[in-house]
């Protein structure tokens, strides 16, 4: 190969090499430009999304059947955590825990965020079937909880009493005895169980029953059997049944009380009408 041809070939290779290097450098520069743009854009977008002034959680939507919970209860629970976060930064689990701790009558709460600035909260309240030891309420599953007294003052519920931690046991006894009494149109107004498992009941007509320990259903059946006789005697004597002590193998001790003035007058008028 001649020297001229060799020089030409070397020259072409140098040009090609420079072109390849230039292309490679351009590719690297383009890639760096793209990466820089993505990073900068991502940083800007993230900063924008985290800016509480741009995406504050400013709307509150409450759902679920509510009897005791007010809108302000939820609002104050959230504000107690501090300034609300943004859509991206606010942890809904923290809000959920806060509501459950501050509002003991809430059975279940779910919190979720709705783009761009909405907080949706669904509430499920406990449903009371009786009052428990005056200060609390109890639901059908035996869960005890408290509600501000002023929000339950108009509710007429039976009263249950028992040692701490005995709500389920008292509730079960209340149901069983209530079912037996309902057959004879009695309603339980109060049911109390002592630490020694001794039972005292108050009926809707304010008659108090002392059942003692053990054989409570048997003793309750005895009262149902005796009641017509006792009621007849009460009407004859112009008195009312105050209490019936059934802590005996048979029979019962009965306490009597004067009739209220209105009932006494009504009974006298009825007796006079019958004589005429």
UniProtKB/Swiss-Prot annotation:
Keywords: Cell cycle, Cell division, Cell inner membrane, Cell membrane, Membrane, Transmembrane, Transmembrane helix. One of its GO terms (biological process) is division septum assembly. Essential cell division protein. May link together the upstream cell division proteins, which are predominantly cytoplasmic, with the downstream cell division proteins, which are predominantly periplasmic. May control correct divisome assembly. Residues 1-27 are cytoplasmic. Belongs to the FtsQ/DivIB family. FtsQ subfamily. Residues 255-276 are annotated as: Disordered. Induction: Repressed by hydroxyurea. Part of a complex composed of FtsB, FtsL and FtsQ. The complex can be formed before its localization to the division site. This tripartite complex can be divided further into a subcomplex of FtsB and FtsL, which forms in the absence of FtsQ. Interacts with FtsA, FtsK, FtsL, FtsB, FtsW, FtsI, FtsN, FtsX and YmgF. It is found in: Cell inner membrane. Changing residue 237 to N: Localizes to mid-cell, but is unable to form a functional complex with FtsL/FtsB. Residues 55-126 form the POTRA domain. This is Cell division protein FtsQ. Residues 266-276 have a biased composition (Low complexity). One of its GO terms (cellular component) is plasma membrane. One of its GO terms (molecular function) is identical protein binding. The chain crosses the membrane at residues 28-48. Residues 49-276 are periplasmic. HAMAP family: FtsQ_subfam.
